[in-house]
C-alpha cells in the first residue's frame, strides 16, 4: 500500500533510518487503517502519500527525538498517531494510548494485536 522506498527516503532526509521490518509493519498498519476506515471513520487521510507524509513521517519525527524514551502517553490518539507509529519505530518505549471514542479504541486494540504490540495499554477515558 505505502511506497516503502519513498517513506524511507523521506525519513532518511531527517536522519531517521527505518529497517525493512519497520517498513513492513508500517505498511501493515496502513492497510489495517484503510480497511477499518471503511467501517468506522478514523481519518480523512487515506491515500498512500497522505498516510506516508501526514501520519507516518510526522509521527516518526516526534518518535526520533531523544525525549521520546521511557513511557509515552498518547492522549486523544484517534487512529493511533503518533503512538502506534512511535512504538513501531521505538519498541523500547512503554506506550499508553488514550482515546475517548469506543469505536476507535476497538480499532486500536485490533491494530495493536495485529501488529504485535499487545503488551501496551489502550485506555478508554
Where do the model's predicted regions map?
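Conserved SAM-binding motif I beta-strand of class I
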Residues: 94-99
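Conserved small/polar residues in nucleotide/adenosyl-binding loops
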Residues: 124-125
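Short, conserved acidic/polar surface loops in the N-terminal third of protein domains
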Residues: 85, 109-110
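Conserved SAM-binding loop of SAM-dependent methyltransferases across substrates and taxa
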Residues: 79-92
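Class I SAM-dependent transferase core
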Residues: 2-73, 103-104, 110-120
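Conserved beta-strand/loop positions that form the S-adenosyl-L-methionine
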Residues: 75-77
Amino acid at each position: 500500500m505505502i511506497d516503502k522506498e519513498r517513506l524511507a527516503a523521506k525519513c532518511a532526509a531527517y536522519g531517521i533510518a527505518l529497517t525493512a521490518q519497520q517498513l513492513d509493519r508500517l505498511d501493515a498498519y496502513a492497510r489495517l487503517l484503510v480497511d477499518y476506515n471503511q467501517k468506522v471513520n478514523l481519518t480523512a487521510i487515506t491515500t498512500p502519500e497522505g498516510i506516508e507524509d501526514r501520519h507516518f513521517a510526522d509521527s516518526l519525527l516526534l518518535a526520533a527525538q531523544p525525549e521520546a524514551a521511557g513511557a509515552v502517553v498518547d492522549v486523544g490518539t484517534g487512529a493511533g498517531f503518533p503512538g502506534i507509529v512511535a512504538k513501531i519505530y521505538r519498541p523500547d518505549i512503554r506506550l499508553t494510548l488514550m482515546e475517548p471514542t469506543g469505536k476507535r479504541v476497538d480499532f486500536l486494540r485490533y491494530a495493536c494485536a495485529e501488529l504485535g504490540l499487545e503488551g501496551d495499554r489502550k485506555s478508554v477515558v
